């Protein structure tokens, strides 16, 4: 880069030079990070560590426990073990008919 005397520059030119330096530093940092992640994935030492979900105060959402797939008795696929209803259907009480 060529030598520039900073004493003779006005504020706008100094801000433009500072902005150019700032953008170059950010681009180099982002590109370096991308290369580090790519190398870690290729070499097999990149892994994501999932933290335990916190309480409601972290995100305002209750943590949901995975209880597995829901199996509805009338929605079984043909050929699956236990095909059909698991229990007998019950009629509703006479006052609701």
From Swiss-Prot:
Domain of life the protein comes from: Eukaryota
UniProt modified residues of type Phosphoserine: 92
Stretch list, region Disordered: 77-97
Location in or out of the cell: Cytoplasm
Sorted UniProt keywords: Chromosomal rearrangement, Cytoplasm, Phosphoprotein
Listed GO CC annotations: cytoplasm
GO biological process, one term: regulation of gene expression
Coiled-coil ranges from the UniProt annotation: none
Note: Encoded by an expressed retrotransposed copy of the ATXN7L3 locus that emerged prior to the speciation event separating primates and rodents.
Family under the similarity heading: Belongs to the SGF11 family.
Protein name: Ataxin-7-like protein 3B
């Amino acid at each position: 880069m060529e030598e520039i005397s900073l004493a003779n520059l006005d504020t706008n030119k100094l801000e433009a030079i500072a902005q150019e330096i700032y953008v170059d530093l950010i681009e180099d940092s982002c590109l370096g990070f991308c290369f580090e992640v790519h190398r870690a994935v290729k070499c097999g030492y990149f892994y994501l560590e999932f933290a335990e979900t916190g309480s409601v105060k972290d995100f305002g959402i209750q943590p949901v426990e995975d209880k597995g797939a829901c199996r509805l008795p009338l929605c079984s696929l043909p050929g699956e073990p236990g095909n059909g209803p698991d229990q007998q259907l019950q009629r509703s009480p006479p006052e609701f008919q």
